């Protein structure tokens, strides 16, 4: 064997050694990487805690993100504004076209007020809203210059008197002066709601426009606010069969929540203010109002309002006379029946009293049926006629409602008269019989009163007005559902926030809305932020801790859901957001303001639950629990 052969063999051994070492390293790496998985797969129940740990990794990730985010303190303007108070001037300007200045009452049968808030430089948008709405508005205007508010208020007066006739005609203007905070959106909303001239309020933002005739269409559906357990079966096709969440028991342990350390102060703040760029069409509005001369249009409205008022008053007087005649006839009949009862024995008297009660109950049921029949007639009218031709129908509906209320009152009076007459007539019987009859009457009255208190309280209902957005000019916005659907199908109009926050409006169920002909209830889910019509006497105020950008409508809708509101979508209604170039903001970025607002929301959610008897650590509407709230994973 020569030297060359030895060298070749040595190199082969060396290469083999290197190959073996490399192979060993690869095997070690594979075993290291696959080891935990193999252990879990082979260990069964014995490694269950490891499996659980892996499943909880996203949850742990959220908690870590929460902790990291919470370490970032809010800006100083947030904390400084938490306890700020504001100077307000309600009714700084009163609507000059729809209000009788002598009586301070509405001329026409307006029953719904748009409630909105704005700044002086965005009044043109609210004026266009008034031109389309043609009904009362309650507008809270934010005066940004707290050191020299007079100059900005003078500018406001000039705009109202000279530039925006529709705004001055329909709008009550309330002023809120800045206190160097972020934009106090919910303070402004509450100011406008408090001073609205009607109990029914429609929450709107200044960038939205309604179609013509929306006020009267909503008014035609007003009977949904009178749904009670006694007549709820008439609406079985419109309402969901909600199960009632179980309230918090006194024995439930809330220590986990009550021991949460961090409670932020009560108020918070933001600034929509300044340098908002608006589209040219908003700033150059055609005020001819449906191609009519403005003065001629307002004159026609006044004449129509006066005629409507006179007709409405005459109808009311006639109804009162009819009711009085009916009452007299009923009283005579009751007296005759009572006289006949005197000849009967004690058992017959009791039977007659029971029959009277049964008749009264039947009368009340008949009145409910009449209400429903009248309302169905209105539905037929709406389906056959244009949305703008409902004024007379609304008046008839309101008269019918008044008649029904009067009938109910008359029936109640007749009940009392029957009882009194029975008591007087029964004096001819012996003392024992009188006592028995009186006791029976009193017991029956008490039972009826208890039933009325338990059964006749209306459900809490809020109308959802479907919200859309578009880049098309406001002059091309549709005024009826058919045209609206065509524009949606052509992608010129789309549901609000469909690309950035699907959860914000998806509960509206836009696909169902396209085909719907009757109102339908939708199930609330966090983080729904609908534009709502509701009765302000049933509702809690907007939370004024929320100032600035973020969660102001979402949190309020959640509070309404917890308080038991039913959200009913009106099928022929819609509003359209007028998309415009991005606005510039003073102060923190929108992202920072949103995270600051979330600090408040994470208190609102459990607080509202506790207030209404629910466990704050139990999910009701897909909302985040306290330990997961400060995160963007739920929105």
Swiss-Prot record:
Residues 1-18 are cytoplasmic. The chain crosses the membrane at residues 19-38. It is a single-pass type II membrane protein. Residues 389-456 have a biased composition (Low complexity). It comes from the Eukaryota. The keyword Lipoprotein does not apply. One of its GO terms (biological process) is protein O-linked mannosylation. One of its GO terms (cellular component) is membrane. Glycans are attached at residues 41, 179, 393, 535. Belongs to the glycosyltransferase 8 family. Highly divergent. This is Glycosyltransferase-like protein gnt13. It comes from Dictyostelium discoideum. The gene is gnt13.
